[in-house]
């Protein structure tokens, strides 16, 4: 039976993950085994449960308990379900709950890149992409367009932040992902060394004098290719581009010279995922 608890005290510590903890506090880098992430909406929560993530607690609009989210409760065992009316929950969290439900999950242990990429042939590498909406959209494209893994550098947005998870529609739970290096100083040199040691050629998505078209036949023939995408404003750093085996451009019309990184990722995954 669901363990349903009516909210009577906004300051109760068990509500901290939903109301007061920052993203860094939720992540808990000092004690990663205690880290938490928040999933939002029944569909996203279902995908997290399907992937084996362990629920810690739920925050749910009262009418959802016997409504669209009832199926989720049956899958969450005795995890506490904190509930109130929609207006009260919005006051508590500071935002309108998508589909009236949030779930706090235990963060998974980080997986080594070497393990993630053991049998991978096409991976996405994200450098310094800090917009959670873009990160979520990139993961959704990576899942849909057959990327084997997504690798982030240490300055990238956490793929398990609430908005990235929501925008990805839970596909962040379906695509293996990991981090290249421990600190920003490890990128690009150490990160590129890891990719090379795993047999990957690297393709920087950037405009330069040596850029080849995304439909260049040599790219499709590469047995293992890492597609490197850069930050929203300035794109990839010059030393990252210089470290890559290829610099790749997307042919465009009407004088347009670039796309939003999430849109560019979808084009790149579609074209460069072909073998």
Where are these regions (language model features)?
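Short acidic-hydrophobic, aromatic-tinged amphipathic segments that line or gate anion-handling sites
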Residues: 4-11, 80-85, 176-187
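RNA substrate-binding interface of SAM-dependent RNA methyltransferases
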Residues: 50, 108-210
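Boundary-proximal intrinsically disordered activation/regulatory segments immediately upstream
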Residues: 1-68, 156-157
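Active-site/ligand-binding-proximal alpha/beta "capping" segment
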Residues: 203-254
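Short, aromatic/basic amphipathic alpha-helical patches
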Residues: 67-78, 240
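Structured adenosyl-cofactor binding patch, chiefly the S-adenosyl-L-methionine
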Residues: 103, 141-145, 159-173, 238-275
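A glycine-rich helix N-cap at a beta->alpha junction
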Residues: 75-94
């Amino acid at each position: 039976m669901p363990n349903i608890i009516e909210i009577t005290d906004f300051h109760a510590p068990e509500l901290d993950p939903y109301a007061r903890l920052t993203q860094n506090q939720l992540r808990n880098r000092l004690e990663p085994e205690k880290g938490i992430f928040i999933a939002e909406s029944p569909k996203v929560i279902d995908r997290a449960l399907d992937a084996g993530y362990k629920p810690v607690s739920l925050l749910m609009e009262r009418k959802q308990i016997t409504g669209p989210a009832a199926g989720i409760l049956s899958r969450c065992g005795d995890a506490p379900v904190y509930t109130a009316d929609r207006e009260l929950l919005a006051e508590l969290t500071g935002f309108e709950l998508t589909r009236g439900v949030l779930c706090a999950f235990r963060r998974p242990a980080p997986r080594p890149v070497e393990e993630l990429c053991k049998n991978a042939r096409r991976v996405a590498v994200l450098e310094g992409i800090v917009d959670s909406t873009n990160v979520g959209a990139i993961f959704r494209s990576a899942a849909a367009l057959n990327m084997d893994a997504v690798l982030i550098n240490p300055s990238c947005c956490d793929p398990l932040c609430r908005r990235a998870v929501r925008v990805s529609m839970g596909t962040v739970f379906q695509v293996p992902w990991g981090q290249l290096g421990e600190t920003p100083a490890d990128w690009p040199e150490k990160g590129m060394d890891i990719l090379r040691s795993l047999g990957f050629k690297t393709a920087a998505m950037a405009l330069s004098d040596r850029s080849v078209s995304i439909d260049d036949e040599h790219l499709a023939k590469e047995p293992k290719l890492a597609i490197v995408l850069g930050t929203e404003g300035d794109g990839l750093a010059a030393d990252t581009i210089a470290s890559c085996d290829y610099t790749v451009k997307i042919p465009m019309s009407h004088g347009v010279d670039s796309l939003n990184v999430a849109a560019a990722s979808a084009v790149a995954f579609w074209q460069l995922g072909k073998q």
